[in-house]
A protein has these predicted regions:
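Pepsin/retropepsin-fold aspartyl endopeptidases
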Residues: 2-222
């Protein structure tokens, strides 16, 4: 039966390490661990690229989840296989990260990001700690009343939430985020001015990790 006539489904288990969803994938035949990050793109540490002999093919300009703009080398992964062997992504573009230091505490070699799942259905089950990846021949069975549509801007999973009355926020559905909701300064100031939120505490520091590494310490509000 042609692939287009049947739905292909892969079950990807994950475990939590330091609040991050960690998954296993085989890169060119070598199984490695990665942070499952819907807010980012596929990225490999330079260390892994060098070990597996994955050459740089291009460069790409990007802005990471911490707002840092940069230009990174781009590589092409010949094969990225799910642990159950059901789905093999081929010719996958990925960013080559300059430093692997921030990833060592998680025991991972990079990110599995949203660009890998373009035109696919991804379901996350927190009870069984599994990620269901399926091709989109069949529509999702979830009730439309429980759905929030994604923005049509690009491939990133951007949704609109309402905070208080009349305050619409465009937010990135980001499984790599350390919290339920992180606000941009402009959104925080807008909500505070409109009485839609209040500050409980204020601190100084940073613990967010993205393709640009660790975020620089700054004032944060809770």
């Amino acid at each position: 039966m042609p692939v287009s006539a049947q739905q292909i489904i892969s079950v990807l288990p994950y475990r939590l390490v330091g609040g991050k969803m960690i998954v296993a994938m085989s890169v060119n035949g070598q199984e490695r661990s990665f942070i499952f990050d819907t807010g980012g793109q596929v990225a490999l540490t330079g260390e892994l690229c060098d070990e597996l002999g994955i050459p740089v093919t291009d460069s790409v300009k990007t802005t990471d989840a911490n707002g840092k703009e940069m230009s990174l080398p781009q590589v092409t992964i010949s094969s990225l296989l799910t642990p159950d062997g059901v789905i093999n992504f081929t010719g996958v573009p990925a960013m080559k990260l300059a430093s692997s230091v921030p990833f060592k505490c998680f025991g991972v070699d990079g990110f599995i990001g949203s660009n890998l799942f373009k035109n696919m259905i991804v379901e996350i089950d927190g009870k069984t700690k599994t990620i269901l990846i399926s091709t989109a021949e069949k529509a999702s069975t979830i009730s439309l009343r429980k759905m929030i549509p994604f923005s049509l801007k690009g491939y990133m999973p951007i949704i609109t939430l309402q905070a208080g009355t009349g305050n619409n926020l465009e937010v990135l559905f980001d499984t790599g985020s350390p919290g339920f909701l992180s606000l941009k300064n402009s959104d925080y100031e807008k909500l505070q001015a409109g009485g839609a939120c209040r500050t409980i505490s204020e601190g100084f520091g940073g613990g967010s990790i993205s393709v640009g590494g660790m975020v620089e310490a700054d004032v944060s509000h809770r």
